[in-house]
Design a protein with these regions (language model features):
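P-loop NTPase motor domains
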Residues: 1-190
Length: 190
């Protein structure tokens, strides 16, 4: 139970960066919020189905499995008091097709960067290192993001946030202190 709650907190942090915080100033947050609930519901459904959760699998459920009716079938099989049902209901129970289309379009707009770049989607769907090693052994990570183009800045923020959360968890497990000192050097970071 503790690991599940921790995993859901990490999922919420990621979705916060990818979707919820990306509402433009002056715009109605309803669209991003509902698209974010859809993303959270799909993510939790993927985990419930014991599939590997990644950007790629979320996009697969949003497009192929939504179009085939599989998402609808899974939704209808859920208990109405489950958190997955509650997350998906804001979208799935809509009867106004225009509203539903606008929410799906908002979802697609917020995840379009990944859909447009297969290389980015693949990179975000796996890892070649363990975050836990950062606080346990000497490690250098170079994250290069173009400073003249802000498109990918939120991904750098997401990585740093996830890394920091991982380091906090490790420090808690090691009586408040990491085995190896960790320095973040952020150059020209906005």
């Amino acid at each position: 139970r503790g690991k599940r709650a921790e995993a859901e907190n990490h999922l919420n942090d990621i979705l916060q960066s990818l979707i919820f915080e990306r509402t433009e100033k002056g715009k109605d947050p309803y669209w991003n919020d509902t698209a974010g609930q859809l993303a959270r519901g799909i993510s939790k459904l993927i985990l419930m189905m014991e599939e590997r959760l990644s950007i790629k699998s979320i996009l697969d459920w949003r497009h192929a499995k939504m179009q085939s009716g599989m998402l609808q079938n899974c939704f209808l099989a859920l208990s109405t008091d489950s958190d997955i049902y509650q997350d998906l209901a804001g979208f799935m129970n809509l009867t106004a097709e225009n509203t539903k289309t606008c929410i799906a379009s908002t979802f697609d707009q917020l995840t379009g960067l990944f859909k447009a770049s297969k290389a980015l989607t693949e990179m975000m769907s796996g890892t070649t290192f363990s975050m836990e090693k950062i606080g346990k052994e000497r490690t250098a990570i170079f994250l290069v993001v173009p400073d003249e183009k802000t498109t990918y800045h939120f991904l750098a923020e997401l990585f740093i946030s996830q890394c920091y959360e991982s380091l906090l968890d490790q420090a808690d497990a090691c009586k408040g202190e990491l085995p190896v000192r960790v320095n973040f050097i952020l150059e020209e970071f906005c």
